[in-house]
């Protein structure tokens, strides 16, 4: 991340490392402001922000004077898994962090596209929307920009829509449960977790 350049229009603060450190600071403020006390939740939110741009070194390029990092959110999954696997063997934790990494741009993408409630429901099947909005907000605020109000627009919009659907802070429901696998003939094992 150190030395991985970013477009100065969107990231005047400098390289990806500086941006990531600023995002961590912003997330700490958000967690304090939101009175989030659950230690496990705080941990996966912080690791979500720490890992959110790990894909940038693999895709950053300069084209016609513009620096882009297309698909960095997807390319960040593999290095996130590699990093997190050195710290823990808790699959659920790693999956939660990687889901935040993979989807951290979604609130802005959905907002800018004025997406339907159906699209928001699809997102809900992948990630806790409230947690995602916290990571997205920290990402947006973790840079040297003057108009910080724009950071709140997308996340507030998405949370409002999710609240309409009553899915803003729902746990992700398992699409396949252990009993479904047993019914298919699988024997219970650690792989079920």
Residues of each region from the PLM?
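A generic alpha-helix surface/boundary motif
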Residues: 21, 74-78, 114, 174-179
